[in-house]
């Protein structure tokens, strides 16, 4: 059961993340064709006033999803004008150095194109898992880093997709670290926090002099603060641009990536089916589905499915079920059953008809291991004139037809074997002395076999 759960969880994870649209060269280009900006930061010369190291390499910013009330923005605007009125430039120059050296200018473009992203591993996922606000409103979709790509006219850049800004049609605040030289992948691949958050912004991974922020919804969304940092604001109403149509090259790359994703999905679904479908259906599919089709149905849906299976396997349709009130007779059964008027009763057995004799029984040897049926041997003598003549009568459980005695001398030698007290019994009913019951049994069996061989068994019951 645990193995099945593990496979189920793994398949669900891959279907959620692995089958999502992977942001590669074909996916990034049509997604981020919105307003973009470039923030350039130049290192201060050594002769300038000493600045804080953290302030030279980081830009302060405000998160887009942190709700900024109008009162707060008015307060900030009032502070900024107050700083300008109190000679804020001099204060910035002494606190942070030259403000113009921190931010040299902004540049807007709507035609960014990436290439050669396939040479590096891509970790960017788009349209993966949606994020929701506490009031159940879509806040954005989870996205991760990308890889080193060629941006525009052949410059190397590390493409990073950060979740939390805008919708998927605008790239979710995509950031590109633009570098002058060769781009090197960072040591940590997945973000621990948002790239543009309350406080600081991570420096560029390729070159600390140029950082691109684009995928914004309007030019006013990214602003330069009085301290020389980068801030986020809400776009005014009606200033959001419409996303442009993708190019042909982008569609080809998108289809190529989609085929790979579909292949991965098919393989994962096959693994899940191997866990769910029994092995008998794989080893003997015809016998398995034949047995399923012939099994009784429990519902209408089950009956319809099994009817389709019967048609596919070439089996006859199931017999029609009669209503519970009616009871129909099959035609074959009706033909075999004659009407009641033609029946004739068989004659009753006569009591005078003698029973057939039992099958002949041959007495086995006394030393045989087979159990010999108990023999009941009786002797009787005629009363009166025939007192001297003695006949030997043997009654057995399986006897032979009675035959007349041949000689009286031989018959007189016969003795009686009684049960359960086995022994040699004389005419007066006493057991011979000097013999135990075991010897009496063996001796009597020998005598009986000799009598049967010489004279046969005499029946005097009549």
UniProtKB/Swiss-Prot annotation:
- Would the keyword Membrane be found if you checked this record's keyword annotation? yes
The encoding gene: US29
Q: Which residues cross the membrane?
A: 12-32, 257-277
User: Which terms are listed as keywords in the entry?
Assistant: Host membrane, Membrane, Transmembrane, Transmembrane helix
Name the domain of life. Answer: Viruses
Supply the source organism's classification: Viruses, Duplodnaviria, Heunggongvirae, Peploviricota, Herviviricetes
Among the entry's GO cellular component annotations, what is one?
membrane
Q: Where in the cell is it found?
A: Host membrane
Q: What is this protein called?
A: Uncharacterized protein US29
What is this entry's stated membrane topology? Multi-pass membrane protein
Broad class of where this protein is predominantly found: host cell
Q: Which family does it belong to?
A: Belongs to the HHV-5 US29 protein family.
């Amino acid at each position: 059961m645990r193995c099945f759960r593990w496979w189920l969880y793994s398949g669900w994870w891959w279907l959620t993340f692995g089958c999502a649209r992977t942001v590669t060269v074909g996916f990034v280009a049509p997604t981020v064709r919105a307003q973009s900006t470039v923030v350039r930061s130049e290192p201060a010369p050594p002769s300038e006033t000493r600045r804080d190291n953290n302030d030279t390499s980081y830009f302060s910013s405000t998160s887009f999803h942190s709700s900024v009330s109008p009162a707060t923005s008015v307060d900030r605007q009032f502070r900024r004008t107050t700083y300008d009125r109190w000679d804020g430039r001099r204060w910035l120059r002494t606190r942070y150095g030259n403000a113009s050296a921190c931010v040299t200018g902004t540049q807007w473009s709507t035609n960014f194109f990436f290439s050669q992203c396939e040479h590096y591993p891509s970790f960017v996922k788009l349209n993966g898992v949606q994020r929701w606000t506490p009031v159940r409103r879509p806040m954005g979709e989870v996205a991760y880093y990308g890889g080193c790509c060629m941006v525009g006219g052949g410059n190397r850049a590390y493409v990073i997709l950060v979740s939390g800004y805008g919708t998927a049609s605008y790239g979710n605040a995509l950031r590109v670290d633009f570098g002058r030289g060769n781009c090197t992948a960072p040591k940590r691949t997945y973000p621990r926090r948002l790239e543009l958050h309350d406080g600081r912004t991570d420096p560029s991974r390729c070159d600390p002099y140029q950082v691109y922020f684009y995928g914004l919804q309007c030019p006013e969304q990214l602003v330069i603060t009085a301290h020389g940092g980068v801030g986020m604001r809400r776009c005014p109403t009606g200033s959001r641009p419409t996303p442009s149509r993708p190019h042909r090259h982008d569609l080809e790359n998108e289809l190529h990536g989609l085929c790979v994703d579909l292949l991965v999905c098919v393989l994962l679904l096959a693994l899940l089916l191997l866990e769910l479908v029994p092995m008998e259906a794989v080893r003997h599919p015809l016998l398995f589905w034949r047995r399923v089709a012939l099994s009784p149905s429990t519902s209408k849906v089950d009956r319809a499915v099994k009817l389709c299976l019967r048609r596919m396997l070439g089996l006859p349709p199931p017999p029609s079920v009669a209503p519970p009130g009616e009871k129909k007779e099959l035609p074959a059964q009706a033909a075999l059953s004659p009407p009641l008027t033609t029946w004739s009763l068989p004659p009753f057995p006569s009591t005078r008809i003698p029973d057939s004799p039992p099958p002949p029984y041959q007495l086995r040897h006394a030393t045989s291991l087979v159990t010999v049926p108990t023999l009941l041997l009786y002797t009787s003598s005629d009363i009166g004139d025939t007192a001297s003549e003695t006949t030997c009568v043997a009654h057995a459980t399986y006897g032979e037809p009675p035959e007349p005695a041949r000689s009286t001398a031989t018959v007189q030698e016969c003795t009686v074997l009684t049960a359960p007290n086995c022994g040699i019994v004389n005419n007066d009913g006493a057991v011979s002395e000097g013999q135990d019951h075991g010897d009496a049994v063996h001796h009597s069996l020998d005598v009986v076999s000799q009598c049967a061989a010489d004279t046969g068994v005499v029946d005097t019951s009549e």
